[in-house]
A protein has these predicted regions:
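Flexible, glycine- and charge-enriched loops at secondary-structure boundaries
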Residues: 30, 91, 145
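C-terminal "cap" of GNAT-fold acetyltransferases
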Residues: 111-114, 118-156
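Conserved glycine-rich acetyl-CoA-binding loop
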Residues: 59, 72-73, 85-99, 106-108, ...
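Acetyl-CoA-dependent GNAT
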Residues: 3-87, 98-100, 104, 139-141, ...
């Protein structure tokens, strides 16, 4: 597990889109069709943000980060682009990425983390719940991913 590098962007975008296809999640108005998905390293630069990746001999196999999404309340960051290839699931990588992203947001001075998700990612939503994220009735901020239907927040 390491910080994202510019060279990781295309491979990471492929992993993210393949997870949407694998789970049958919506492909429109989501991370899937967002052109920024191919520029995660670029998006993080110069922001109070962070992104970690899981990498092996085959390259980048997933990642997770936090980002000050436009329109969020003061002190909030969004947990962003938390996706893993099936090749690295079930080995504790997701838990480590998730915990490190939460801790990174806390160290960066954020008071809350916000998440948007889908019912198709029920295992991830259950993990968020176990880690103290609570459901809220409506979206916060303007990620542009208007197809999301699950909104959660955690005080840090």
């Amino acid at each position: 597990i390491r910080h994202i590098e510019e060279k990781d962007q295309q491979q990471l975008a492929h992993v993210i889109r393949s997870v949407f296809e694998e789970y049958g999640a919506p492909l429109v108005n989501t991370v899937y069709d967002d052109p920024r998905t191919e520029h995660i390293f670029d998006a993080m630069a110069g922001k109070n943000a962070g992104y970690l990746v899981v990498a092996d001999d085959g390259g980048v196999q997933g990642g997770c980060g936090y980002y000050p999404t436009e329109g969020l309340p003061d002190g909030y960051a969004e947990l962003v682009k938390f996706y893993l290839s099936p090749l690295v699931r079930g080995q504790g990588n997701g838990s480590v990425l998730f915990s490190q992203a939460i801790e990174g947001a806390r160290r960066a001075g954020y008071s809350h983390l916000y998440i948007e998700s889908f019912p198709q990612f029920s295992d991830a939503v259950a993990m968020y719940e176990r880690h103290g994220f609570r459901h809220i009735p409506q979206r916060l901020g303007d990620s542009g991913h208007t197809a999301t239907t699950i909104f959660m927040v955690k005080e840090l």
